[in-house]
């Protein structure tokens, strides 16, 4: 029995200006959640000094989290839904469009 889909991804070679500041990361994540038609319940973001961001969006279907390391051009993403699994794929594609990584690797897990 499959109850959800989980994508874990590492994006490499992301431009620093896209991932260094909380307000930019927040804007991208919130837009992706909205466009992927995920049901946002709440969110928390943390700006690190001198740069880097962690954010978690609680969605009714599960969660989306992001961790950034601008000094390495690195973004770690975690997207999980126990709802419509196509929304996870849509969210991941939107993140790729927004962050434009030079390369990435990702794992797709069917949960359950």
From Swiss-Prot:
Its cofactor is pyruvate. The modification Pyruvic acid (Ser) is found at residue 62. Coiled coil: none annotated. Binds 1 pyruvoyl group covalently per subunit. Keywords: Autocatalytic cleavage, Decarboxylase, Lyase, Polyamine biosynthesis, Pyruvate, S-adenosyl-L-methionine, Schiff base, Spermidine biosynthesis, Zymogen. SUPFAM superfamilies: S-adenosylmethionine decarboxylase (SSF56276). The active site is at residues 62, 67, 82. Is synthesized initially as an inactive proenzyme. Formation of the active enzyme involves a self-maturation process in which the active site pyruvoyl group is generated from an internal serine residue via an autocatalytic post-translational modification. Two non-identical subunits are generated from the proenzyme in this reaction, and the pyruvate is formed at the N-terminus of the alpha chain, which is derived from the carboxyl end of the proenzyme. Its EC number is 4.1.1.50. The record marks 61-62 as: Cleavage (non-hydrolytic). The keyword Lyase applies. Pathway: Amine and polyamine biosynthesis; S-adenosylmethioninamine biosynthesis; S-adenosylmethioninamine from S-adenosyl-L-methionine: step 1/1. InterPro entries: AdoMetDC_fam_prok, S-AdoMet_deCO2ase_core, S-AdoMet_deCOase_pro-enz. One of its GO terms (molecular function) is adenosylmethionine decarboxylase activity. It catalyses: S-adenosyl-L-methionine + H(+) = S-adenosyl 3-(methylsulfanyl)propylamine + CO2. GO terms for biological process: spermidine biosynthetic process. GO terms for cellular component: cytosol. Belongs to the prokaryotic AdoMetDC family. Type 1 subfamily. Heterotetramer of two alpha and two beta chains arranged as a dimer of alpha/beta heterodimers. Catalyzes the decarboxylation of S-adenosylmethionine to S-adenosylmethioninamine (dcAdoMet), the propylamine donor required for the synthesis of the polyamines spermine and spermidine from the diamine putrescine. This is S-adenosylmethionine decarboxylase proenzyme. It comes from Archaeoglobus fulgidus (strain ATCC 49558 / DSM 4304 / JCM 9628 / NBRC 100126 / VC-16).
